[in-house]
Amino acid sequence: MGKRIISQNRGKGTPTYRAPSHRYRADIKHIKFSGDLVRGIVEDIMHDPARTAPVALVRLENGEKQYVLATEGTYIGQEIACGPAAEIQPGNTLPLASIPEGMPICNIESKPGHGGQFARASGVYGILVAHDVGATVVQLPSGEMKWLNPNCLATIGVVAGGGRTEKPLVKAGKSFYKYRSKAVKWPRVRGVAMNAVDHPFGGGGRQHPGRPKTVSRGTPPGRKVGSIAARRTGKR
């Protein structure tokens, strides 16, 4: 009898496969404001294991502290503002209705009050394309055009940490630490490279599945590997 395969262990949710969320800084949201404006001072810029971009610790006028996404050019001691009356400069957060067309923006809300869902990875940004009646057109980093509520908040500028993907990992140790901060088991071993006890495709004198790779939708756990409920296989 074989052992439980990796997909079964992942489904159970053992510590090996859980995201280390206890190490994450905070859930990054936009600064809440009452009225037209709230200001704050950037006290620190630090790494967050939860994301690829650096985060900035901001002390607000009322003494509270909050983490926000750092934009390119952010520095310690910088004053940032949030609200409809904020200045049009990188790092400030305004409703889409208050931002001029053609401006690069990041940390864009999908709905008012949701805190920011689009363009949050390092080095990315969206473009505010046009203002329409009751809607604002924003081009996302993927190129998709999105019609959003003009009251949705967005931060002006480009998310800091650009060029991250241009630096090669070079060695496996770097990749190990990269994936350690995520809910990903790394390295990922192929089933045909395993022993027969570890995977349905394992074992044998050479690396081949030894059986059809297609399985039905109702296949029990431990055997449900390969092309699941495939309509077709092979090259098109």
Curated annotation (Swiss-Prot):
Disulfide cysteine pairs (residue numbers): none
Signal peptide: none
InterPro entries: NA-bd_OB-fold, Rib_uL2_dom2, Ribosomal_uL2, Ribosomal_uL2_arc_euk, Ribosomal_uL2_C, Ribosomal_uL2_CS, Ribosomal_uL2_dom3, Ribosomal_uL2_RNA-bd_dom
Coiled coil: none
UniProt-recorded Gene Ontology molecular function terms: rRNA binding; structural constituent of ribosome
Region named Disordered: 198-236
NCBIfam families: PRK09612.1
Function noted in UniProt: One of the primary rRNA binding proteins. Required for association of the 30S and 50S subunits to form the 70S ribosome, for tRNA binding and peptide bond formation. It has been suggested to have peptidyltransferase activity; this is somewhat controversial. Makes several contacts with the 16S rRNA in the 70S ribosome.
Name of the protein in question: Large ribosomal subunit protein uL2
Organism, as annotated: Methanothrix thermoacetophila (strain DSM 6194 / JCM 14653 / NBRC 101360 / PT)
Designated gene of the protein: rpl2
